[in-house]
Amino acid sequence: MADLVKKHFYKITLTIPEEFQEMSSALLSDFPFTGIEDEFDEQSFTIEDVYWDNGNIANQLLSILESTSIPAEIKDIMIIEDQNWNAIWEESLEPVQVNESIVITPIWKAHQIESPIKIIINPQMSFGTGYHSTTRMVCRKLQEYVGANSHWIDAGCGSGVLAILAEKLGASYIYAFDNDEWSIANTKENIHLNNCSSITVEQESIFSINLPQVHGIAANLYRNLLIPNIYKFAKALEDSKGVLIMSGILRFDEQEIIDCAVQHNFIHISTEYEGDWTAITMRYNA
């Protein structure tokens, strides 16, 4: 019997500012990558050698990003041997203690966890695990502001962690949306894992959606998505004079976000910091 040919992969690491990474992932989604890794101001794209095309693919990535004014440069290219990427990645994930009462845990370690509030997820490599510092900060703010029988929006729900937490904290209706079909599928899966029944999930773009009236909004989005849509958040909070919790914001964008929200009749309540990231809480006050 002939030996199986072992696959090789190329890992292309680009320097891309954090606030552009969601957009770059979307723009490059048609390429047959086996994995995408997001780090601070870096993204790595892994592709099988059969698609390498003598290195032309790296220049194609840069050309696409430059055409949309996303600043990017090639930092590193390396050849790596075939591995069980998903198994390696899963082994690296540990339950995350958000605070003394909230834990986010991958499903394969859920049986090890005892916590007043346990959020079980089946993390997906393609769009995030819900473990980012911005998610943790919003979780802590939700614990402050979600009231019994309140209504909430999870804008850009990703894996659905924030929507699930809102229900566990007592919200009776949560509207969660994302423009990514895989995020929607994963959110629905995680809703089922947590036995939630008060969450409505839809695939929608934040630029075209009409938001319902609610008591609060959790928007863990990048600056370029928050600023053009703060007016929508204001409209959704008109009746309740509710709270808007925003994250996905780098420290140097904090004041610009606050100023924009103030122009739409929000008042600033607080700002939290974790590393280079911030979470800003505002209240509608027209």
Where are these regions (language model features)?
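Conserved beta-strand segments of alpha/beta enzyme cores
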Residues: 34-35, 73-76, 103, 151, ...
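A structural alpha-helix within SAM-dependent methyltransferase catalytic domains
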Residues: 29, 164-167, 230, 234-235
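Amphipathic, non-transmembrane alpha-helical secondary structure
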Residues: 26, 62, 136-139, 143, ...
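SAM-dependent Rossmann-like transferase core, predominantly class I methyltransferases
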Residues: 85-147
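S-adenosylmethionine
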Residues: 179-286
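N-terminal auxiliary segments of SAM/dcSAM-dependent transferases
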Residues: 5-113
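Conserved SAM/SAH cofactor-binding pocket of Class I
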Residues: 125, 129-210
